[in-house]
Structures are given as structure tokens and as C-alpha cells.
Amino acid sequence: IFLNPSDVGGRYAALTFVGLVPAALMGLEFEKLLDYAEEMLETCQPDVPWEYNPAAWLSEYIAERFFLGQDKLTIMADPLLRPYALWIEQLVAESLGKEFTGVIPIVGETPGSPTVYGPDRIFVYLGLRGRQDLYRRLFADLKEAGFPLRPYWLEDRYEIGAECIRWELAVALCGVWLGVNPFDEPDVIFSKKKTKEVLETFKQTGEFPVEFYLDDDLQIGFLYAGGLKVQYPRLRAVVKKFLYETPPWGYFAFLPFLPYDEEIEEIFTDLRTLMRGRRQCSTILGFGPRYLHSTGQLFKGGPRTGRFLIFTRKGRVAEQEIPGWGFTFWDLEFAQAYGDFQALGERERPVLHIHFTENYKEDLRKFYRFMEEITRLSDEEE
């Protein structure tokens, strides 16, 4: 039994038993991770002059640009380090996204030419020495276009231990700059409360308290909330409203509560690239329910610049029941999705809930083609 310190929040627990025990079970040299971490910690002490303090430098880079209106922290990573970038996404979003402010981390986008990025972007690259050629041309193009870019080169992947220290301290210091508490997550509980209410209704009635509109063309269900108003509840009209009312400094968040596989992620990655290319807006992809404890705090507590698209599917007859709870895993997942839809709507965050049939992959492909058409027509109308 490993007893973890109770006063360390999940996103700051990477170098506690939470991260080290799994690393040891995988056969990794966790002592090497800690050696790198200790070296970084020594250089980030309060008595180290600012210009020699790696965490202070990173904090200043993020905060200074934030106050210049560049709040989209775009994190690009060597393919071997991409899972680590997801941890940074949670660290930044959950620590700084509250009280109607926050730095918005953008992770996992397909790299593009400078013309597809808005002026609200700054860039960080996480790379491995010996593999610098992967993004050399992109770096040159971004710098030539005037985008702030800061690369961090790791000697090997064990140096992630040092980077955990750098980022944890830098983000905590950013909280001071932004005037928020980087160690709480006051809005996460709101979605949990809504989910619980949805499940209670389901257990009492056997039905979810939701009735979707049906799009005649695509034959998929949809709901909308968060201040979105259209004369007739048609999916085309709602999506157009999404597009027209999204400011250039806004962002789109695609939030699928769908069975994960590479094909699904690839389609959503294409959707992100499409929206970025047509609207020059930043995009986020968060699979549910994971994102609820990652970027979910930012979505409900951060700046009101996001547009949110939640995706669910119809449950199958033979879904696995959770023993002793009276509902299935699908029921729980749907309640989490609909609960977050309600939470976003009540916080006046424009949100669209798309509900697919059991053939959700084909429905998703149809939805992509629909978005391709609607964004093209919107561009022509403008």
C-alpha cells in the first residue's frame, strides 16, 4: 500500500506515488526521473536570480503574452512526447482557467502554415535532441511570421522529470500573475452535480430527462444551449450561429463521449484542421469523460470565448451494467455528457449536443461532410 500525500492535487502529483508507482511497474528507472527533477528544482529556488530560473522564465513568457492578448498556449511536441503534452494541457487548463480568465492550452493540432494561426497564439515546442529536424521548417516559418516560439529540448525522455518541475512551478507562478488560485478547481463540481441529478431522474423514471431535436437531412439528434438562439431549431441554423458568433480570438472544443479508437480521433483531428483553416480559430479535442477532470474547469470557469460541441451515441441493448448501481456504463457516460451540456448552458457557454445513432462512425463522417459544406458556404457569404 502506497499512501500518497493528501494535500497534493492530481495534476501536481506526477512525481508522487501517483506517477512513480505506475512508472516502476512498467519497469522504468523512476530514480532517474527524480534525479532530473531534483536538478531542476535546485535551479528554480526563490533565491535563484530570475534570469537563471527556468520556471520563472517560462512563467514570464506565458503571462507576459497573456496580457498582450495572446492567451492560446499552443504546445507542439515530438511524437514521442505527445502523451506528456496532455498532462501540460490539464495542468494549465485546470490551474489557470477560472474566475472568467485563463490561459487556453492547445494540444494535438496538426501543424500548419503560419497563415492558419490567429494572432492570439504563442508556441512552445517539446523536443528530443537528435530529432531537431522534425519541425525545423515550421519553426522558421513561425518566427518569420512574428509568432512567439520557445523550444525546450530534452536529452532523453527521462528528462520529463525535470520538465514536470519546471511546468508545475511556472504554472503556479502564472496563477499569481493572473490573480487566481492555481491549486483549486471550483467549477469541476458543477458538472458532477448535474450528472448526479440526471442519474437520479433516470433511476426514478427509467428515462433520461432529455428530448433531442432531429435533423431531417443527417438523421441525427441535437440540442443547443448557452445563449444560442435561432428562429427554428434546425441544425444548419444552429451551426451557422456557432460560426458567425465565434470571435477570431475564440476557440472550438470538440468533446466526444464515444468509444475511443484511432479512426475516431483521426476524424476529429480533421475537424479541428477544417475549423482552424476556415475560421482561424484555435481548437481543442477532449474525449469524455476524461476532459471533465482536465480542460473541463477551463470550459466552465475560464473566459467566455469557447464554443463547445458534445457528441454522444445511442446505447446498445446489451450494454454492461455497473453491479449494484442500477444503470449501465453507457447510462453513466451519457449522464456525464448531458450533465456537462447543462452545466455549460447554465454558465452561458454556447454549446451544441450532437446525438448519433448506434452507427456513430458513419454519423460522424456525415457530420464532418456537413461541417465542410457549412463552413465553405459561410466563407462565401462573408
Model-derived features with residue positions:
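Active-site phosphate/pyrophosphate-binding segments
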Residues: I1-V124, R129-D133, L169-C281
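Low-complexity, glycine/alanine/valine/leucine- and proline-rich hydrophobic stretches
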Residues: L142, Y152-L154, G326-D340
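Amphipathic alpha-helical packing elements
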Residues: L271-G301
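Ligand-binding clefts of soluble mixed alpha/beta catalytic domains
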Residues: V176-E185, R313-P323, F327-W330, A337, ...
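Phosphate/diphosphate-binding loops
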Residues: R129-G146, R150-W153
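C-terminal amphipathic alpha-helical interaction region
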Residues: D184, I189, Q204-V210, D217, ...
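A generic structural motif
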Residues: L3-V8, S95-T110, P148-I160, R278-R290, ...
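Conserved, well-ordered active-site substructure
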Residues: P289-W325
